[in-house]
């Protein structure tokens, strides 16, 4: 099972983003699953873009519903607490804590993360996630 992180999903949904076609192609035919936190991050980013590039939250939600018909994957409360403990013990901070949540969710559900964000590597490795990094 493959699950895109925000660095793949945002360009896949937004034609104005560099890498749009590449991200769409990477997801095509793979029946990707959606991590709940990635859905929130993606909706947040795309709905606060500059005028002309911005997408309405309802438009993003509709795209997510269409592209990810299966139930989203998430951590239960106990696993979220364990994730934060592991992330803090690994020395992660700031935005890397969100990367840790995404990675832990993928690991918990047996998914491989599809990412274009090599900056998240430390967090993904600290959480023990399998990651497929996009080329380019």
Report each predicted region and the residues it spans.
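Acidic, PIN/NYN-like endoribonuclease modules and their adjacent C-terminal/linker elements
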Residues: 1, 103-136
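Active-site-proximal, substrate-binding regions of enzyme catalytic domains
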Residues: 43-89
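Active-site neighborhoods of divalent-metal-dependent phosphate/nucleic-acid chemistry enzymes
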Residues: 70-118
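Histidine- and aromatic-rich ligand-binding microenvironments
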Residues: 4-5, 34-36, 92-96, 117, ...
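A generic structural signal for short hydrophobic patches within well-formed alpha-helices
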Residues: 9, 39, 120-121
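Aromatic- and histidine-enriched alpha-helix N-cap/loop-to-helix transition segments
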Residues: 34-40, 101
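Short, well-structured N-terminal submotif of metal-dependent ribonuclease cores
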Residues: 1-35, 50-59
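Short, structured coil segments at secondary-structure junctions
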Residues: 28, 68, 126-127
């Amino acid at each position: 099972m493959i699950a895109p992180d925000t660095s793949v999903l945002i360009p896949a949904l937004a034609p104005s983003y560099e890498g749009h076609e590449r991200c769409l192609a990477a997801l095509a035919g793979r029946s990707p699953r959606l991590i709940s936190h990635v859905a929130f991050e993606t909706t947040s980013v795309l709905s606060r873009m500059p005028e002309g590039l911005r997408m309405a939250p309802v438009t993003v939600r509709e795209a997510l519903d269409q592209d990810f018909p299966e139930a989203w994957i998430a951590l239960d409360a106990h696993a979220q607490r364990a994730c934060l403990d592991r992330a803090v013990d690994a020395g992660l901070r700031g935005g890397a804590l969100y990367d840790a949540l995404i990675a832990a969710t993928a690991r918990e559900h047996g998914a491989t993360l599809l990412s274009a964000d090599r900056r998240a590597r430390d967090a993904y490795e600290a959480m023990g996630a399998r990651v497929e990094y996009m080329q380019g």
